[in-house]
C-alpha cells in the first residue's frame, strides 16, 4: 500500500460519517507493514506496564519491541488536555513512541517530541493528502524502527529513567 492509497482509504471511510478511531486501524497496519517489511505490526497488542498502546512494532524471531503507536480518531487534537494523562503515561513508559490521529504523526524518543509530520488534512468533508511530506514520513518511519534503546551511561540518566517508572507505578 502506498501512502496515497492509505490516504484515499481513510478518506473513503471518513466521508461515510460513521467511521471512528478503530475503523482506520487496518489501513495504518497495512501501510506500516508495507513500508516496514521486516517489522511485525500488531494491532491491539497485550497490555503492558504503562497501558495498552494501539500498536506494537516488533522485529526478529523473538519479536523484540522496537516501538509503539497510540492512535486517536481523525480530527482529535493530539494536544488535548483530556488525553494528557494517557499520553504522559506512554511518554514516560515507552522509549520509542508515535502518537497519531492517522494524519499527523508525532514521534517521541525517551519522552521528548523529536518530530511531527502531517501527511493529510481535513478540508471540508474530505481528507486531502500532503504528498510533499510522503518521502520524509517514510524516512521517519524507517528510522523509528531502527532506534535501539539507549545504554545507561551515567547515574543521572538512570535516576531519570527510574523516576519515570516510579511515577507509572504510583498511578
What residue spans do the PLM features occupy?
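Conserved catalytic cores of phosphodiester-cleaving nucleases, focusing on short active-site segments
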Residues: 28, 55-57, 67-73
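Short amphipathic alpha-helical patches
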Residues: 29-37, 51, 55, 92, ...
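Charged, often low-complexity linker/regulatory segments
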Residues: 1-47, 165
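Short, basic/polar, glycine-containing "phosphate-handling" surface segments that engage DNA
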Residues: 1-11, 60-65, 72-88, 92-96, ...
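Generic hydrophobic/packing signal
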Residues: 25, 31, 41, 53, ...
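Generic alpha-helix structural propensity
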Residues: 19, 23, 27, 50-52, ...
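Active-site metal-binding core of divalent-cation-utilizing nuclease and nuclease-like domains
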Residues: 38-63
Amino acid at each position: 500500500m502506498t501512502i496515497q492509497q492509505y490516504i484515499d482509504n481513510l478518506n473513503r471511510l471518513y466521508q461515510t460519517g460513521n467511521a471512528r478511531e478503530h475503523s482506520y486501524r487496518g489501513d495504518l497496519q497495512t501501510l506500516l507493514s508495507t513500508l516496514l517489511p521486516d517489522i511485525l505490526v500488531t494491532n491491539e497488542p497485550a497490555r503492558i506496564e504503562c497501558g495498552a498502546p494501539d500498536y506494537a512494532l516488533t522485529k526478529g524471531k523473538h519479536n523484540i519491541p522496537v516501538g509503539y503507536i497510540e492512535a486517536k480518531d481523525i480530527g482529535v487534537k493530539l494536544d488535548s488536555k483530556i488525553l494528557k494523562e494517557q499520553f504522559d503515561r506512554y511518554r514516560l513508559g515507552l522509549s520509542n513512541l508515535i502518537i497519531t490521529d492517522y494524519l499527523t504523526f508525532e514521534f517521541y524518543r525517551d519522552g521528548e517530541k523529536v518530530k511531527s509530520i502531517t501527511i493529510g488534512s481535513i478540508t471540508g468533508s474530505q481528507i486531502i493528502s500532503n504528498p510533499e511530506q510522503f518521502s520524509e514520513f517514510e524516512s521517519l518511519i524507517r528510522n523509528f524502527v531502527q532506534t535501539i534503546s539507549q545504554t545507561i551511561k551515567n547515574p543521572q540518566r538512570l535516576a531519570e529513567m527510574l523516576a519515570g517508572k516510579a511515577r507509572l507505578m504510583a498511578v
